[in-house]
């Protein structure tokens, strides 16, 4: 459940580096626990997703499936980790103690143009737990965040509280939001009644606090 732009950039990366790939249809909103946005939704989502990938891999003669989990992912709330362990997914980066920063450093050495791509997260994390998720709600969050990214703000989160859009950006970009009234109008046009800026700045796992 990632922004369309992230998906397109991933496909572009694979093609540029001549990496063979196969797309598998996956609809997380059909998973009851995910749609209800339960606190352990990631467990159910990751289990179905990775089970499907492993099944497809086995069909094509591959014994093992690796993921990109890193050491930092082991230090925060990640219910999906339990699912991958149960399925037998291998996480080599986490096993050797590679952090996000280590990955960026090595990616830069390899000349990968995505080495400094800002991290992102599942769009479901923008909503309070136990909020029913819909395609429309996820889409308007994606569109709202894209409005801000076009202004040169690299990391953005729009947290949804019913009619309120709570914007989280790194504090150094706060003035970009405050000085651009047009942002408010564009985000309101997506269906929000109020648009606010969180003075705490960007907070990973905001609804886990």
Question: Model features per residue range: what roles?
Answer:
Residues 42, 85-86, 134-136, 176:
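Short alpha-helix boundary/capping motifs
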Residues 26, 69, 118-119, 160, ...:
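Proline- and acidic/polar-enriched loop/turn elements at helix boundaries
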Residues 94, 98-100, 104-148, 155-156:
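Mid-to-C-terminal catalytic subdomains of enzymes
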Residues 1-109, 150, 165, 181-192, ...:
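ATP-dependent adenylation/nucleotidyltransferase module used to activate substrates
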Residues 34-37, 77-80, 127-130, 168-170, ...:
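Short secondary-structure transition/capping segments
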Residues 142-209:
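Peripheral terminal appendages
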Residues 36, 117, 177-178:
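Non-catalytic, surface-exposed connector residues within folded enzymatic/regulatory domains
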């Amino acid at each position: 459940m990632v922004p369309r732009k992230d998906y397109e950039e991933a496909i572009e990366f694979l093609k540029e580096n001549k990496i063979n790939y196969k797309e598998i249809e996956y609809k997380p909103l059909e998973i009851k626990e995910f749609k209800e946005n339960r606190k352990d939704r990631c467990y159910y989502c990751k289990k179905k997703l990775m089970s499907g990938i492993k099944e497809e891999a086995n069909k094509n003669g591959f014994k093992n499936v690796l993921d990109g989990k890193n050491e930092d992912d082991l230090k925060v709330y990640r219910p999906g980790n339990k699912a991958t362990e149960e399925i037998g997914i291998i996480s080599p980066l986490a096993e050797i103690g590679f952090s996000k920063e280590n990955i960026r450093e090595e990616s830069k050495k390899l000349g990968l143009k995505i080495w400094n791509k800002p991290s992102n997260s599942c769009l479901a994390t923008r909503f309070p737990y136990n909020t029913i998720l819909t395609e429309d709600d996820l889409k308007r969050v994606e569109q709202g965040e894209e409005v801000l990214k076009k202004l040169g703000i690299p990391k953005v989160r729009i947290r949804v509280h019913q009619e309120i859009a709570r914007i989280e950006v790194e504090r150094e970009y706060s003035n970009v939001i405050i000085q651009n009234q047009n942002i408010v109008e564009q985000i309101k046009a997506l269906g929000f009644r109020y648009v606010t800026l969180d003075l705490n700045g960007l907070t990973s796992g905001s609804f886990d606090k």
